[in-house]
């Protein structure tokens, strides 16, 4: 069981930044993304754009709102990203069948080809971790991260989390 710190007794020397969970997650994200970023840039894409392409590759035809939620980007950021993706010919928007005010987003053939060509590099980035952790440890880590995300999301929605 992890001891919860006493907020009245916080001292920086007792809580080194490099042991902080958010710091560790961010630092690992940087290492994972650095490898993929090089390959994305060669194809004229970026990490933020890749997230949208990757989500759509898993489930095409999502609304902009659904995409925002899944990628974790606010609506204005989603609109900007989709405009760029559309200008590159990687996605297209089609009117929602029952609500003409909304649109659904689809990968184009060109977008699908891009995802297929970049997916091996994304998998390589993930597999680097398998050189460090066993498959069992990787699965445990995934499960813990999923649990953490769900808990953090719930706290955020409930207003208990800034």
Model-predicted regions and their roles:
Residues 1-43:
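N-terminal leader segment of winged-helix/HTH proteins
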Residues 3-4, 8, 33, 83-146, ...:
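Charged, amphipathic alpha-helical coiled-coil/dimerization segments
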Residues 52-53:
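Short alpha-helical "packing" element that flanks the helix-turn-helix/winged-helix DNA-binding module
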Residues 59-63:
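Short capping segments at the starts of secondary-structure elements
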Residues 64, 104, 144-162:
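Alpha-helical transmembrane segments and membrane-interface helix-loop junctions
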Residues 67-68:
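A short acidic, leucine-rich amphipathic alpha-helix
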Residues 74-77:
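Helix-turn-helix DNA-binding motif, specifically the short coil turn and the N-cap/start of the second
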């Amino acid at each position: 069981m992890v001891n919860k710190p006493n907020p009245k007794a916080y001292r920086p020397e007792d809580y080194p930044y490099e042991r902080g969970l958010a710091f560790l997650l961010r630092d690992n994200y940087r290492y994972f993304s650095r490898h993929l970023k090089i390959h994305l840039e060669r194809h004229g894409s970026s990490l933020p754009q890749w997230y949208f392409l990757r989500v759509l590759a898993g489930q095409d035809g999502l609304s902009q709102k659904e995409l925002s939620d899944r990628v974790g980007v606010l609506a204005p950021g989603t609109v900007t990203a989709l405009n760029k993706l559309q200008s590159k010919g990687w996605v297209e928007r089609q009117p929602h069948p029952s609500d003409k005010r909304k649109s659904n987003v689809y990968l184009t053939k060109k977008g699908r080809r891009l995802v297929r060509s970049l997916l091996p590099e994304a998998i390589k980035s993930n597999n680097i971790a398998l050189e460090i952790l066993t498959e069992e440890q990787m699965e445990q880590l995934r499960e813990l991260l999923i649990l953490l995300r769900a808990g953090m999301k719930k706290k955020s929605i409930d207003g208990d989390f800034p």
